[in-house]
Structure formats: structure tokens, C-alpha cells
Amino acid sequence: MDGGSYTSMVPVPTILDNLIHDGKIPPVVALFVGNSSPQARDNELNCSDAWGDFLAKEAVPWIGSTMNVRVNTNGVLIAGSSMGGLAAACAAYQHPETFRKVLAQSGSFYHANIDGEPEWLARQFAQSKQLPLDFYLEVGLLETSSIPSRDPSMLTSSRHLRDVLIAKGYRVDYHERFSGHEHLAWRATFGDALIELLAMRETDRRVHILSSDHQ
């Protein structure tokens, strides 16, 4: 998600090249997906069924056919930050047959979707059977503002989603960091996040909280 940001402010192509060169991850093919306008971004990344279908049924098959590569039968890793983090987790929830690993940096998990109630995605995971998904979630300890003011903050909603996923039996690697909602923080952690998520094992449920006042 937010492909423009992940090729500039978070230099993922360079990060991937370095990790592959150093043998820290296997060779990968990366697709950077953007939205046509800010309004389209707001609509498409808010757990849109149409957007999830586009990613799973058009974008991923396009990679295989265009680049003449075989898509991993164990699933595709999907990543994003902010609304993109929400969209990544939503796409995996909608299409677990395609996406198996979710990397969400400061995900906007407070969002309500169409029912008007906040934290829509956490409620979907709580009410559904466990899916074959692994998660790397991170959020900044300074992300305590509510948007809008009546909704939980990114920090609170990330903690809630973490608790729901762990209670349902998902493999979750969760980090709280001394940072805000900013690309500088995300670029500093993306490489390690990718390494940890790709190396996740059956029994891994790791929670890393750097706050002295956490829940």
C-alpha cells in the first residue's frame, strides 16, 4: 500500500536489495501499489471489498504473468502503514487464500468501515474462525490522539487488535516503539519487521512493549 511512500520516504527497494544481498531474506518480487487520488485512498484503503479483490485477483496474478514468476503457494506478504496498514490486514482477512503474512506499521485500526462502529476489523477477527495468517504489528507510543475524537487512538486500537489476534490463536509479533506517526520511524524498522515476519514459526507470539505504562 502507499507505493509512492514506500519507494521514497521509506526506501523499501534499497532495503530489500540490502537484505537479499546479506542473505537475511530470500529473493523476493515486490509490487508497490498506489491510489489515484487522496479521496480514492480514503475509500479504497478503508477495508474496501473491491480493493481487496483487486489486490488478490488482479494485482498478484499480474505479477506472476508479467514477470514470469511463480507466486509462492504459501501466500504473499502484504504491507502498509497508517491506512495502508489497515488495508493490508483487511486484504488478508478478505483473501487468506492469497495473503498469509501482514506487516502493518501504525495501522489505522480504529476505523469504523460501513457500520459506523470503530475498530471494525478487530471485531471481524473476534467473530470469525482463525485464518492461516501471521502478523507483524507496530505502533508508536506517541500515537495517542483519536481521529475522530470519539474513536480509540492508533495505540489503543493496535493493542486491542493484538489482544484479539492472540486470543484467537494467531501468530503475532507486536512492537510498541518510542515514536509518532511518521515515515522516519517506519523506515527505521521496516527491514527488521520483514526479517521477523518471514522467519515467524508456529509457536511465535512475541510482544515487545517499550513503555513503562502499558496495558
Regions of interest found by a model, annotated:
Residues 1-215:
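Non-catalytic cap/lid and distal C-terminal segments of serine-dependent acyl enzymes
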